[in-house]
């Protein structure tokens, strides 16, 4: 499937071989790992902004749940680790529960609100500033 957006999106220099694994580290944490953000598509840009603002946060881009689940358990464990998970996805949270059952979720399970992209991100709390504040509290980061 080809999925397009009306929004301007940053090219994160994705490697096709990595994408074909279904999930991979797109941003490596600075310092000791404290948490892992799971995201996909255009939300990865916001996830990286959050991770750049906090030490110890890794961003994993999930390109395909089915392909990721087919990878060896050792690979999946290396990518996800046992650290707390944060899910950032402007769609349903449903697909992420098996990876982040006790995680912090920034998702949209309600639809029908109209507005510009900026207005909707603000309404749903999907701005780097709001997310950073909640992630700090969730991970008990000063």
Give residue spans per PLM region.
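Thiamine diphosphate
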Residues: 1-142
